[in-house]
Design a protein with these regions (language model features):
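Sec-dependent signal peptide recognition
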Residues: 2-9
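Extracellular structured ligand-interaction cores
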Residues: 92, 103-105, 116-118, 139
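C-terminal edge beta-strand
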Residues: 113-130
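A short beta-strand micro-motif common to beta-rich folds, especially ectodomain repeats
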Residues: 101-111
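Solvent-exposed, low-complexity, repeat-rich "mucin-like" stalks and linkers
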Residues: 23-84, 131-140
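Bacterial signal peptide processing site
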Residues: 19-21
């Protein structure tokens, strides 16, 4: 009986340690490419490594990296506060966003570590309520 209980116990531990399938990625550009993307909730997101507002390749990407994160206040986030992880695979950058609000920049890099292109990630829960006034008019 002790042996059976031990086997069941070990089996439960092994099952608990199994990795679940990764959270599916939400593509950020289903219709058009961009240089800035709005993320309104935590999750896994992806976008193609093309130059903003076009379909031209940014070059031979081998890695992706978060260059900086900001809450837009006088408080500085620690690394990973907004973007938990970022990677490059098969022409796409994939990242995991937290539920915090702010801004981040993700860069595509070549084999020498040179930045080929970067994208602004704007993390807000109210993108439809944002307005920016300038001499050219109002941007919403």
């Amino acid at each position: 009986m002790k042996k059976l209980s031990f086997i069941i116990f070990i089996s439960l531990i092994a099952l608990a340690g199994c990795k679940k399938d990764p959270e599916p990625e939400l593509p950020l550009q289903p219709l058009k490419s961009a240089n800035c993307f709005i993320v309104s909730e935590a999750g896994r997101y992806s976008f193609e490594t093309v130059k903003g507002e076009g379909n031209e390749s940014v070059g031979e990407v081998v890695a992706a990296e978060v260059l900086w994160e900001s809450f837009g206040t006088d408080k500085y986030p620690s690394a990973g506060s907004l973007i938990k992880s970022v990677s490059y695979k098969d022409g796409e950058i994939v990242f995991k966003a937290t539920d915090k609000k702010g801004n981040a920049v993700i860069a595509a890099k070549d084999a020498d570590g040179n930045i080929l292109w970067s994208w602004h990630i704007w993390m807000t829960d109210q993108p439809q309520e944002q307005e920016y006034h300038n001499n050219a008019g109002i941007v919403m």
